[in-house]
Amino acid sequence: MPKQEGQKSKLLTLLRILEQKTDEEHLLNVPQLVELLEQQDILAERKSIYSDIDTLRSLGYDIQLRRGRGGGYWLASRTFELSELKLLVDAVQASKVVSARTSSKLIHKLEALCSDYEGTQLQRQVYVDGRPKSDSHTLLYSIDALHSAINAGRMVRFRYKDG
């Protein structure tokens, strides 16, 4: 793709970089942001980065700047705090109605809600004694259908089977 075509997606790409590559402990300065954009075939000048960050801030994104040596920009506010994501991961892993495969998929999706660095902290194993994981891959869909029926005020019938 020619570099000029990449300019249309520059603002969104810059936001994705800040979401994935920054947190309070991992900052990116303007030259690093320019380099990461260039890796995505997007040309950027130093002045345009400042303008783009101002635009993102005006759109409600909490992008902070730490000045001085080792300083740079980071996305300060996210939908979930890291501690909240850890709680959700623990709940998913401890749930007996969620299969190990589905747990892994859900945790991977939760990792996308924080920086790459914080995401590695979500890879933890919770063991609940005496609570086996379900083998059913369709159990979540069944639970969702049950909730939908209850919310719609519909009658629900169960058919039990052994094993």
Where on the chain are the PLM-derived regions?
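Bulky hydrophobic/aromatic content
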Residues: T79-K161
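Short, basic/aromatic recognition patches that contact phosphate-bearing ligands
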Residues: M1-D90
